[in-house]
From Swiss-Prot:
GO molecular function, one term: RNA binding
Main location: cytoplasm
GO terms under biological process: translation
Family: Belongs to the eukaryotic ribosomal protein eL13 family.
Keywords, in A-Z order: Cytoplasm, Ribonucleoprotein, Ribosomal protein
Domain of life according to the entry: Eukaryota
Function according to Swiss-Prot or TrEMBL: Component of the ribosome, a large ribonucleoprotein complex responsible for the synthesis of proteins in the cell. The small ribosomal subunit (SSU) binds messenger RNAs (mRNAs) and translates the encoded message by selecting cognate aminoacyl-transfer RNA (tRNA) molecules. The large subunit (LSU) contains the ribosomal catalytic site termed the peptidyl transferase center (PTC), which catalyzes the formation of peptide bonds, thereby polymerizing the amino acids delivered by tRNAs into a polypeptide chain.
Protein name: Large ribosomal subunit protein eL13
PROSITE patterns the UniProt entry points to: RIBOSOMAL_L13E
Taxonomic path: Eukaryota, Amoebozoa, Evosea, Eumycetozoa, Dictyostelia
Length: 209
């Protein structure tokens, strides 16, 4: 079978192809096996969460940047703003990605707050129960600790608020094209250097005259 968005080829079946049809009769059993593996993993890592904390990121390119999704890991800048180091963050269930870079203040603020919320709910078990260090949980907090059995969601991290009451759109809003505006802004940003250079050449020629 071809991969990606390509034309499906005309298959010429020969050599008893009916005996080579791929089947998935083990699908129900695999579902049970995955469920049992999740239960075993939760028991093995108890009391830690079954998944690491991931940042909220936007997909690359104009096609996908309208939607948010879970990223690979938090940037060093986000960890620093939350008062954490990369080495320590990995030990308390926080994913770290040293390659990703914050390009907007919005993403930095959002993920920093996500880290702080995680830390506020985090219960660090002390190595020595009778002598807990600063930041580690007491005996009472350890007794009340609950394991998180679901991955940390991304959608819940962004609060959707409506500041305006419902109203009818104006004629200007109906004619407004968000895609065309973004496309024009993107094109303008790409050609800003070329247009500046052309303007300088034109001004220099005008000065010579």
């Amino acid at each position: 079978m071809p991969i990606h968005n390509k034309v499906l080829s005309n298959d010429h079946f020969r050599k008893h192809w009916q005996m080579r049809v791929r089947t998935w009769f083990n699908q129900p059993a695999r579902k049970i096996r995955r469920r049992n593996n999740r239960i075993e993993k939760a028991a093995k890592v108890f009391p830690r969460p079954i998944a690491t904390l991931k940042p909220v990121v936007r997909g690359s390119t104009i096609r996908y940047n309208m939607k948010v999704r879970a990223g690979r890991g938090f940037t060093l800048e986000e960890l620093k703003a939350a008062g954490l180091t990369a080495q320590y963050a990995r030990t308390i269930g926080i994913a770290v990605d040293t390659r990703r870079v914050n390009k907007t203040q919005q993403s930095l603020t959002l993920n920093t707050q996500r880290l702080k919320n995680y830390q506020s709910k985090l219960v660090l078990f002390p190595r020595k129960v009778n002598a807990p260090k600063k930041g580690e949980a007491t005996k009472e907090e350890v007794a009340k600790a609950v394991q998180t059995l679901k991955p940390f969601t991304v959608k819940s991290a962004i609060a959707v608020t409506c500041e305006q009451t419902p109203r009818k759109p104006t004629e200007a809003e109906k004619k407004f094209s968000a895609y065309a505006t973004l496309k024009a802004a993107d094109s303008k940003a790409k050609t800003v250097g070329i247009r500046r250079k052309a303007a300088e050449i034109k001004a220099a020629k005008a000065a010579e005259k």
